[in-house]
């Protein structure tokens, strides 16, 4: 039995989304800019998706923009803010545990003279709001904080941070990378004082190559992709109609039972942790109180993550040794370093990430496998 537990890297495409996308590829394949029936038929799918996401996020459809994925959404939010507000200030704040799609554009701006401050986190991966308050300045134009950490699953205090930012720095924008939370944890950006929010299709059983950027009507950022002026000039390029429609379909499926799914996965995760708790020298990373149940980070002492990963692969169990987006460029995890994982354990951490399709039977099987292979792998390591 194949057991896929790398859902934070990507998810299996929804069958309903695939069916809809196939219809669009073969029948409604027109260009949305074309002034004929084929163009209008294609445009209907974009309008329907905008309406759907506006309903999900409780915002206006004019605040929804489609991108090529989470990385583009994050880059647009950060670089677009810098381009539009650069004359007012050159200061941004982010955290020490962001995904590379946020940390890399921040590093890019820093190399061009911007002042970037990084919030530290505690041993569970949570930021300190008092530190955030102390870093806010008159020339701060953007704060970017992820909702759910992609490596350890810690959930940041987004609502409290957003309220603080808008009270202390009313002209500053608040960006949230919600790529690991969207479709799993309900979130209302306007209620949480979020100006910019990024989401990705393939993390919730939609197709790859499609993302979303919510831009609050109060926020004004510059486009970073120029051309034909599509999407009200915010993101040029012919819309990926099949991708957007598939994203919307998949989102509707997961949001239909989002709270029930959350509770079920939380129970499965807790039960799994309990069942492996008798294995010595295993540490659960992240926050016991503030976490996404869809992500479980485990440090297994004296077992190299890559060796562990391939041992599980031999059993047709698929997990991750870190963020898949950076796995082709192996380096020490900035998140694990930030939460003070001991140096000897940095290379002994794996991530199991669940989906709404994950079953009790699958996790019971994984528990049994861990009980058998970890002692065996340690025999070789400890010789």
Residue ranges: model-predicted function:
Residues 1-383:
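Pyridoxal 5′-phosphate
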């Amino acid at each position: 039995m194949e057991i896929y537990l790398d859902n934070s890297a990507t998810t299996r495409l929804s069958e309903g989304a695939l069916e809809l996308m196939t219809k669009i590829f073969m029948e409604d394949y027109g260009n949305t800019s074309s002034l004929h029936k084929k163009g209008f038929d294609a445009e209907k799918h974009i309008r329907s998706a905008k309406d759907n996401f506006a309903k999900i996020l409780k915002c206006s459809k004019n605040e929804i923009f489609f991108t090529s994925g989470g990385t583009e959404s994050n880059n647009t939010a950060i670089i677009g803010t810098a381009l539009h507000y650069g004359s007012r200030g050159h200061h941004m704040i982010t955290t020490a545990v962001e995904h590379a799609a946020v940390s890399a554009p921040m590093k890019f701006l820093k190399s061009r003279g911007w002042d970037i401050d990084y919030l530290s986190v505690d041993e569970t991966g949570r930021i300190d709001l008092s530190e955030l308050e102390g870093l806010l300045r008159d020339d701060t134009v953007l704060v970017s904080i992820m909702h759910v950490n992609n490596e350890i699953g810690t959930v940041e205090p987004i609502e409290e941070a957003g309220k603080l930012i808008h009270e202390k720095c009313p002209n500053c924008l608040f960006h949230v990378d919600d790529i690991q939370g969207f479709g799993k944890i309900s979130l209302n950006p306007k209620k949480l004082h979020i100006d910019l929010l990024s989401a990705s299709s393939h993390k919730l059983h939609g197709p790859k190559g499609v993302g979303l950027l919510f831009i609050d009507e109060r926020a004004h950022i510059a486009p970073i992709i120029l051309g034909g002026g599509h999407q009200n000039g915010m993101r040029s390029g012919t819309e990926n109609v099949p991708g957007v429609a598939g994203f919307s379909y998949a989102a509707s499926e997961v949001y239909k039972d989002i709270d029930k799914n959350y509770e079920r996965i939380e129970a499965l995760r807790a039960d799994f942790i309990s069942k492996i708790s008798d294995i010595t020298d295993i540490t659960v990373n992240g926050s016991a109180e503030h976490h996404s149940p869809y992500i479980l980070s485990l440090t297994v002492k004296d077992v190299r993550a890559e060796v562990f990963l391939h041992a599980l692969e031999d059993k047709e169990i698929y997990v991750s040794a870190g963020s898949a987006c950076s796995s082709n460029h192996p380096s020490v995890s900035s998140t694990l370093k930030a939460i003070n994982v001991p140096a000897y354990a940095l290379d002994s951490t794996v991530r199991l990430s669940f989906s709404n399709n994950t079953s009790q039977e699958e996790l019971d099987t994984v528990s049994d496998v861990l009980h058998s292979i970890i002692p065996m792998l340690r025999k070789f390591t400890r010789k």
